[in-house]
Amino acid sequence: MNSVNSIRSTFLDYFHLNGHKVLSSSPLVPRNDPTLMFTNAGMVQFKNVFTGLEQRPCKQATTAQKCVRVGGKHNDLDNVGYTARHHTFFEMLGNFSFSDYFKEEAIFLSWNLLTKEFCLPKDKLLVTVYHSDDVAAELWRKISNLSDEKIVRIATVDNFWAMGETGPCGPCSEIFYDHGDEIWGGPPGSANEGGDRFIEIWNLVFMQYEQVSKEERVELPHPSIDTGMGLERIAAVLQGVHDNYDIDLFRALIGASQEITGVEATGDFIASHRVISDHLRSCAFLIADGVLPSNEGRGYVLRRIMRRAMRHAHFLGVKEPLMWRLLPVLVREMGQAYPELVRAESLISETLKLEEMRFRKTLERGLGLLNEASSNLKEGDHFNGEIAFKLYDTYGFPLDLTQDALRCRGISVDVDAFDKAMQRQKTEARANWSGSGEAVTETIWFAVRDRVGATEFLGYEIEKAEGIITALICDGKVVDHISSGQKAIIVVNQTPFYGESGGQIGDSGIISSGCFVFEVHDTQKKSNGVFIHIGEVKSGQAKTFECVELTVDVVRRQKIRANHSATHLLHEALRQILGPHVTQKGSLVLPDRLRFDFSHPKSVSSEELKKIEDLANDIVLQNSEVTTHLMALDDAISEGAMALFGEKYGDEVRVVSMGNPLEPEGLKKRWSIELCGGTHVERTGDIGLIHIVSESSVAAGVRRIEALTGTAARLYFNRQDERIREISSLLKTVPADVGERVSNLLHEYNRLSQACIELRKKIILSGNTIKNNQEDITIINGISFMGRVVRNILPRDLKALVDDGKKQIGSGVVAFISVAENGKGSAVVGVTNDLTDKLNAVNLIHILSDVLGGKGGGGRPDMAQSGGPEGDKAVGALAALRASLEKI
């Protein structure tokens, strides 16, 4: 069978046999392209190759690239589930030539694969060429024997590809498949080309020009090839179906969705099952590549996708988290091709489950409000954009969910009104905000770099060096000298000072000459390679182009080194104890402590923290050598080095290795191997000791540990030991017995506290606590009523009193009001079960709440609570309740 997995393998094997190097898919978050939110095409990882900024050892490559298209020019989100071919996540199969073969070979390779390997009927295929590309048209005739009617010339920009306003560009040739005349639609270039009969399955881009300016385009001396074939589309063709959602992969996901929900994928429910299956793929792969749900950037897009799927799960009647239950099916179907899914399965599962649980209340409330606000609308109407904004701003219900929920009823949202409301809020927010007054901009560092070049870093080998001052900055301006007492920035041609980056704080120390002393408080490394030394002139006057001596604070740096090396050991220990899904999400390396943020869906238990700490300290005790090597990025990754998500790496990287494996770990020769530009200890024993002092949550799916090393850890234990001795002295016991002694005291305290509570309840229920209480129990309209005012009783204890009161009267109503020291009143009303058919505690509590100045209240028919600021009206509140019972 032509399964998705076999088609992918056939494609890659075919091009491998034809001289192409098979390369892995790049992550969904582009490593070196800030212009893209997500990887959306196969050529993204080769962008710098095509522009000449990067060289690859191979001239021909082939990939199966995972892609996400949501937002910007390529935004398929709103259409997903309602068409046969739109997806948020898809795979793009591609072959690439970097200044090697060109049009003839590209056309031959594509035609041969489709007709010989995939055995597609030639009469089902037709192609397009750019209207002026006579060479491509002639090559198609020669290679395929297609008639002129099957080689369609297209004059629109759709058949001419450009990377941007400038850069490589060229004509395209698209290959279409004819699904048959039973499906409406015409061939490309016709009036009915928007139909679904003729579907593009492959696009060949002939990069033969460079766009120099808007008016000028020149021939490239060495043209290239970039092609892209949608795997889901070709799978539909080869499996004999017209709809992408009918291929084996989606059949498996939708089948599982039907089984779990108990709802067939028919009628109005088809789109929901499709949305869930598609969105599961994009969510799972984004999480596997390090994106976690948040309220900004990529994390916000992920959250939008997840919540759209949740809305459709809600439409299917699902009351519990669904997507995580479908994940094992996705891993089974795609895990072999993409092992990152297997590695991150537990993280993906927990993230999906937690996000769905968090959003469920918002979803239910938002849909309820939306249904209420749109109840009078009919098909073709517009929903008020101001109300849509209120749903978003007040209740956290996103616009796209409002649109999606109304779409099935044929109702659109007034987006212009929504945007105006959003803009009005932003304008008001800006009016209430005042800036920081920061005068220095980043442009100054580019000017310095252009004038004097980047700073050479010497600090891996030495901590003292000589250099020449190349720039002085004071009050945000470049100056030629600085004097005693001035706070300023010094730039030197070379420095041993480490500039803050990769989470490691910058060095401090002294820059001096015979004429001045400058105290460096911090060192920063700017993105263009300029190191800036921030500090204050302590004496004398410094001038540009003066020869100086730079001396790093060695003691401080040693502490930083120990903490940085400890983060590497903790990172690996976290992965070994919690699982390979753990990846670094942030770090802070200071002289006195370290902080490490990592991906993990739930809190780390005390037992797990102890195992992590013990494992890291085992490597410290090895006292093994810490080594650094420069090597090619691909070689480093193949040797097991961990690349940090979101970091940009060049062709050559610095690899830091430490520790010997505690057990055989395949080809991995060192315990921890990471790409890192920071400073580290010479041997793991130099760390001394690692102690984790806290574990907490940073964001959904991100945890944080803080730790101490060396002297800081020793001092921490000394302080703890001193505290234990002080406590043991107070408890009149030895330190070893402190735990048992405290446990006994707590047990006795709890026993006495409970005894006090029971005694107080007896006193209150006896009716002798406050003068204004009515005597015992009164009968009103045949209903027994106990109403009392008490002092300083907590709400939870007040409930217990009401329960006891209900037992005491057997049948009737019990109302207690507790007046606190601050004058506020807390009220609880109880109704015995035999009376709840005619008396509701929620209605009765509202009477008390109104008198106490409160806002309603809530609960069950047999028990409700409320309160208010006017506790001095407690007696009047009980009187109002009695009066109400008299009217029944």
From Swiss-Prot:
This is Alanine--tRNA ligase. The gene is alaS. GO terms for molecular function: alanine-tRNA ligase activity; aminoacyl-tRNA deacylase activity; ATP binding; tRNA binding; zinc ion binding. Binds 1 zinc ion per subunit. One of its GO terms (cellular component) is cytosol. It is an enzyme of class 6 (ligase). CDD domains: AlaRS_core. Its cofactor is Zn(2+). Keywords: Aminoacyl-tRNA synthetase, ATP-binding, Cytoplasm, Ligase, Metal-binding, Nucleotide-binding, Protein biosynthesis, RNA-binding, tRNA-binding, Zinc. Zn(2+) binds at residues 564, 568, 676, 680. Belongs to the class-II aminoacyl-tRNA synthetase family. Its EC number is 6.1.1.7. Catalyzes the attachment of alanine to tRNA(Ala) in a two-step reaction: alanine is first activated by ATP to form Ala-AMP and then transferred to the acceptor end of tRNA(Ala). Also edits incorrectly charged Ser-tRNA(Ala) and Gly-tRNA(Ala) via its editing domain. GO terms for biological process: alanyl-tRNA aminoacylation; negative regulation of DNA-templated transcription. Coiled coil: none annotated. It holds the Pfam family tRNA_SAD. It is found in: Cytoplasm. It catalyses: tRNA(Ala) + L-alanine + ATP = L-alanyl-tRNA(Ala) + AMP + diphosphate. It comes from Bartonella quintana (strain Toulouse). Consists of three domains; the N-terminal catalytic domain, the editing domain and the C-terminal C-Ala domain. The editing domain removes incorrectly charged amino acids, while the C-Ala domain, along with tRNA(Ala), serves as a bridge to cooperatively bring together the editing and aminoacylation centers thus stimulating deacylation of misacylated tRNAs.
